[in-house]
Amino acid sequence: SRQATPPTFARYTPTNPFRDGQVQALGIYVQDDMHFGPLNVLAGLRHDRVKGKAASMNNGRVTTGLDRSDGATSASLGAVYEISPLLRPYLNVSRAFRAADLRERYQSGPRSDGFYYAGSPKISPETATQIELGLKGRDERLEYTASVYRSRINDYITGMELTGQAAVAACGQVNAAACKQNLNLGHVTLTGADAGLRWQAMSDHWLRASWSMVRGENDDLNEPLFQMPADRLALGWDWRLNGQWMLDADWTLVKRQKRVATRFTRGGEDPTPGYALVDVGATWQFAPQQSVRLAVRNVGDKRYHDHLAEGLTGREL
């Protein structure tokens, strides 16, 4: 008789970034909407308490020091003055608070960007002060908005690549070559502007336009903030043929993003070229609450890379 040797199977170890993680939030909010003739004032006050806890993280290796509670009071004050329906300047000043979510606190393991992330259960919440100045208006044929803003964020939450002994301590020797951990930057500043318009050029024809830009600064390192979107301009057209059919087309232009973080990423953030995309679509409204839509995105199948889309690191198979 013959006896065969049983096959050898690979043994896989389950990966559990964290277990029994919870983020509990309680907020109390009051608001008053006041009218003084053409002046409308909106004031709000809010207090939040946020508590995070987990039984373990990093595949059960860490079981202590995982609880954190935070609280903050935030407020906003806005005013709109209606000179006419088409001319309504406004100003808004606000103070905001954001605590880390479950993933930012506890997830310990590989992510889609190719890095192994170490959990940060004691990460501090963000607080931000923002001022916004704008203009808006609308009537039967025209609707528009335009604004500029500036926001200063303390304890900004972001992921940073670690090297050397810091990477070994956070991610272990096996994952030290591609290790990141969420941390707080002391101060960052966002300065931006955006605008939007919708205009009925003729019967059943509407033209649309929107534009946005933002400049982020890492005030700790005096360089551009990591992963800021490129300037974007979008132009669109809608044509309602009758009560059932509508055709639309969009042209999106994205500017080259050359403002990249070099010191923070150790040269890991690259500039991305600009691009232009064309989308077209048709919608058939065959019932009051039902419709069928056919659309072609990126006509011509143009190759492009959005700056906020993270590519592979080169360590994947």
Regions found by a protein language model. Name each.
Residues 1-88, 99, 110:
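Signature of Gram-negative outer-membrane beta-barrel scaffolds
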Residues 2, 36-38, 47-53, 93-99, ...:
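Transmembrane beta-strands of outer-membrane beta-barrel pores
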Residues 28-34, 77-81, 123, 133-137, ...:
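Residues on the lipid-exposed face of transmembrane beta-strands in outer-membrane beta-barrel proteins
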Residues 38-41, 86-89, 141-144, 203-207, ...:
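Repeated loop/turn-to-beta-strand initiation elements of outer-membrane beta-barrel proteins
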Residues 38-41, 149-153, 172-262, 300:
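Gram-negative outer-membrane beta-barrel transporters
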Residues 82, 88-94, 122-185, 189-191, ...:
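Membrane-embedded beta-barrel scaffold of Gram-negative outer-membrane proteins
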Residues 97-98, 152-154, 159, 253-261, ...:
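C-terminal beta-signal and adjacent terminal beta-strands/loops
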